[in-house]
Amino acid sequence: VSNAIALRKSFAVIRQRLPGQTQPVEFQPRVLFNPDMKTANFMVPGLIGIVLQVVTMFLTAFAVVREKENGTLEQLMVTPVSRLGLMVGKLAPYAFIGAFEVCMVVLLMRFLFQVPIAGSILLLAGFSLLFLLTSLGLGLMISTISANQVQAMQIAFLVMLPSVLLSGFMFPQESMPFPIYVIGQALPVTYFIRVLRGIILRDAGFIELWPQAIGLIVIGGFL
């Protein structure tokens, strides 16, 4: 929107300087991926990533710490179940909740907010699954380092604040100072928002979005 306004002002200046002359070239600005300049077309796809991270991260953040407070974590550790099996058992219900949430939010975006989906639904589903696993890992890490549920909630809120402000959801990252920009690159939701807007608005394919996949895989592997 700001670029369109600046472009319009530039054309007005040109017309003022050449009032009585015929311009050999007529400038007509054209918006490619959001021609109606609807705010919902830009904000709602990014909102999918924010909502998905909020729900999955907060639910998972309480998964292990609740067992610590109830004193049942030690009992689970001495069972024949492996640590991998225990982790999968803890995360599986939240993964199903996250998948259901993605379906519901996409349906609301399409039919309630009337945002068209230009790209591949299958590609969107694949990236959503990758981001879902990364977000679950982030919530599990918060749950592991927290001593109680209050502390887990505080850390989760501490993670969510930069996720909303620095991920490009509200403000373009290109206009941020470099240190703030670097912090934004460490957030998994940054890459997922780029994927969402790329697929939904620009019909972007995997060839264009593979750097975002690498970013999610690296962060997910670290978590």
Segments the model singles out, each with a brief description of its role:
Residues 66, 75-83, 145:
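Short helix-to-coil transition segments within interhelical loops
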Residues 83-157, 161, 206-213, 217-218:
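Alpha-helical transmembrane segments and their short interhelical loops
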